[in-house]
From Swiss-Prot:
Full protein name: Recombination protein RecR
Organism: Acaryochloris marina (strain MBIC 11017)
C4-type zinc finger span: 59-74
Role summary: May play a role in DNA repair. It seems to be involved in an RecBC-independent recombinational process of DNA repair. It may act with RecF and RecO.
Coiled coil location: none
GO biological process: DNA recombination; DNA repair
Domain Toprim: 82-176
InterPro entries (alphabetical): DNA_Rcmb_RecR, Hlx-hairpin-Hlx_DNA-bd_motif, Rcmb_RecR, Rcmb_RecR_Znf, TOPRIM_dom, TOPRIM_RecR
GO MF term list: DNA binding; zinc ion binding
Keywords, ordered alphabetically: DNA damage, DNA recombination, DNA repair, Metal-binding, Zinc, Zinc-finger
Family classification: Belongs to the RecR family.
Amino acid sequence: MSTVYTRPLARLVEQLQRLPGIGPKSAQRLALHLLKRPTAEVEALANALIEAKQQVGFCSVCFHLSADPVCDICRAPSRDKTVICVVADSRDVIALEKTREFKGQYHVLGGLISPMDGIGPDQLNVQPLIRRVHQTKTQEVILAINPSVEGETTTLYVGQLLKPFTRVTRIAFGLPMGGDLEYADEVTLARALEGRRDLD
C-alpha cells in the first residue's frame, strides 16, 4: 500500500476495496468520508456490520436471508404456498418483492451453475428445492434466473428436474442477455412476472 496513507487509513482503504463495485478511488473517498464523521456515527456503522454478520443467516425453507430460522415470507399466511419462484440470490428476492406483484414463496439457489468457476449443481440449493416440491402441494415453479450463459444452464437443469412433478415456467425478460434482475426497474420485473411462460 502506498506511503501516502497512514497504516490505519491504508488498512481501511484496502478493506473497502474488497467490497463489490468499490475500486481504489471509491474506497479512498469512502474512507476519508468516514474519518470526517463523528465517532458515534462510525461506531454505529461498525456495530451494524458486526450485528448483521452475527445475526443474519439463511431461512431453513427457502434460503433467503433471515434473522430467524424461517424468514418472514415463508411464515406469512397471506403468501401463496403453491407457487415457488426460484432465484439465484437474495438480491433477486429483494428486487422481485419491490414489484409487489408476486404473492407466492421463493427458493434461493445460492448461485448459478458455472463449471468455469467450479460451481456445479451440488454446490447450490437444488436438492432442497426438489424435496420441497415433493413435500408440498406446489402447483407451479417459476424460474426467475438471469439470462446469462450460467443462468440458462441453471434454468434448463432445474427445469428438467422439476418438470415431471409440477408446472415449470420462466419469467419473460425485458432484459438483454447477460442482464441482472437486481438492476432492472420494478415495471420491467412486474411485466416479466406477468409474461412468464411454460419451460419448453
